[in-house]
Curated annotation (Swiss-Prot):
A Pfam family annotated for this UniProt entry: His_Phos_1
Family under the similarity heading: Belongs to the phosphoglycerate mutase family. BPG-dependent PGAM subfamily.
Protein's recorded name: 2,3-bisphosphoglycerate-dependent phosphoglycerate mutase
Associated pathway: Carbohydrate degradation; glycolysis; pyruvate from D-glyceraldehyde 3-phosphate: step 3/5
Residues annotated to bind substrate: 8-15, 21-22, 60, 87-90, 98, 114-115, 183-184
Primary gene name: gpmA
Oxidoreductase keyword on record: no
UniProt GO BP: gluconeogenesis; glycolytic process
Alphabetically ordered keywords of this record: Gluconeogenesis, Glycolysis, Isomerase
Superkingdom, natural source: Archaea
GO molecular function annotations of the record: phosphoglycerate mutase activity
Database matches in Gene3D superfamilies: Phosphoglycerate mutase-like
Catalytic residues (positions): 9, 87
């Protein structure tokens, strides 16, 4: 049996402001820093250690990983960064307030944009300064790899090859791996590992700052998965993610 740990980054500044973030490179909020430290302590208390780590190229995930490794006294571990683990690109929604967007377009439409499988938000214009072609961290990628918007299906299409080519062989070699990533890149990987049907993925929400442990067999099929942490806190955090588009009261 192999063990893999998935961790959504701690709360970001735009999570706190309830904005669509996507590939925008915002940092952790003060609460997010606390959540990252809590994740490290939970892993320590449960007896986990790791051989290597994977994360995205966005600072909220990178900093979460740094804090976890520092808390666990594992700062020396090798860390692999890949844009393929980035958050889903939210296109022209990036930077917009989620509740205001819901009031403008309707809850059903925004739910499809946020949690649907194949629906893409409105795309960024190619000349928009938020487009990833203007970001030097993606300079080595061809234009076809740079999204102006993504559905979860698109996100899965870039996450799964990274899993198959870079992570799965390490898992099979017995490496103990921690992946610090984002809500939708983790949703994509969970969908793939658990064979969640397209029409059921809408209901899957990943809370910030709680380690998600997967026990998997020799063929990389999940045996079971569970969160580390207080069940009531995990439930409230998960409900909070689902409730981000509720109208103001």
């Amino acid at each position: 049996m192999y063990t893999l740990v998935l961790l959504r980054h701690g709360e970001s500044t735009w999570n706190k402001e309830n904005r669509f973030t996507g590939w925008t490179d915002v940092d952790l909020s003060k609460d997010g820093i606390v959540e990252a430290g809590r994740s490290g302590r939970l892993l320590n208390e449960a007896g986990f250690t790791f051989d290597l780590c994977h994360t995205s190229v966005l600072r909220r995930a990178i900093r979460t990983l740094w804090i976890v490794l520092d808390t666990m006294d594992l700062m020396y571990l090798p860390v692999h960064h890949s844009w393929r683990l980035n958050e889903r690109h939210y296109g022209a929604l990036q930077g917009l307030d989620k509740r205001e967007t819901t009031e403008k377009y309707g809850k059903e439409q925004v739910l499809l944009w946020r949690r649907g499988y194949a629906v893409r938000p409105p795309a960024l214009a190619e000349e928009d300064p938020r487009h990833p072609r203007f970001d030097p961290r993606y300079a080595g990628l061809g234009p076809d790899a740079l999204p102006a918007t993504e559905s979860l299906e698109d996100t899965l299409a870039r996450v799964v090859p990274y899993w198959k080519n870079s992570i799965a062989p390490e898992v099979k070699a017995g490496k103990r791996i921690l992946i610090a990533a984002h809500g939708n890149s983790i949703r994509a990987l969970v969908k793939y590992l658990d064979h969640i049907p397209d029409n059921e993925i809408t209901g899957l929400n990943i809370p910030t700052g709680f380690p998600l442990v997967y026990e998997i067999d020799k063929d990389l099929h999940p045996i079971r998965h569970y969160y580390l942490g207080d069940p009531d806190e995990i439930r409230r955090a998960t409900e909070s993610v689902a409730d981000q588009t509720s109208a103001r009261k």
